[in-house]
């Protein structure tokens, strides 16, 4: 087993605090402080010469949007931005693999894009009918994601 890098550990700690906020009634978490911690680990793409920095940056941007949503209460707007970031990450991977820009038609026909959109719609359908915080549903969703163990671009997720 490999040791988790400090930035990875910080990222996962912040994400775990979000899950805690969603599932533990009256959890007291300083998300402004967590946002500051996240900002410290955002990679500078100019410091790297490999594709992996792009999805890492996207993941930090998405988590940052999530933290802003919690802080400001702008969940719908931020959820749309996070959805677009995630889809953009998949598009970037496909274009990097093809070593060219792909048209919208080409992207829409790719299995990876279909899978990403299917997953996003599945999550949306599960959550849209919730009138209040459904802790069991949230925990079930979290467990399903953890069990999958693979990111939207095929990277193994360390637990």
Q: Where are the model-predicted features located?
A:
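C-terminal auxiliary extensions adjacent to catalytic cores
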Residues: 88-159
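Structured binding/interaction patches within domain cores
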Residues: 1-105, 109, 113
């Amino acid at each position: 087993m490999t040791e988790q890098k400090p930035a990875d550990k910080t990222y996962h700690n912040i994400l775990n605090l979000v899950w805690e906020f969603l599932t533990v009634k009256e959890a007291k978490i300083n998300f402004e402080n967590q946002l500051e911690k996240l900002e410290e680990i955002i990679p500078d793409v100019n410091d790297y010469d490999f594709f992996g920095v792009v999805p890492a940056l996207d993941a930090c941007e998405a988590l940052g949007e999530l933290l802003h949503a919690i802080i400001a209460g702008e969940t719908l707007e931020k959820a749309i931005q996070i959805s677009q970031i995630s889809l953009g990450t998949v598009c970037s991977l496909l274009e990097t693999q093809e070593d060219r820009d792909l048209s919208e038609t080409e992207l829409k026909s790719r299995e990876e894009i279909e899978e990403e959109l299917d997953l996003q719609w599945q999550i949306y359908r599960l959550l849209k009918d919730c009138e209040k915080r459904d802790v069991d549903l949230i925990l079930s969703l979290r467990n399903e994601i953890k069990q999958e163990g693979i990111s939207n671009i095929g990277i193994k997720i360390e637990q």
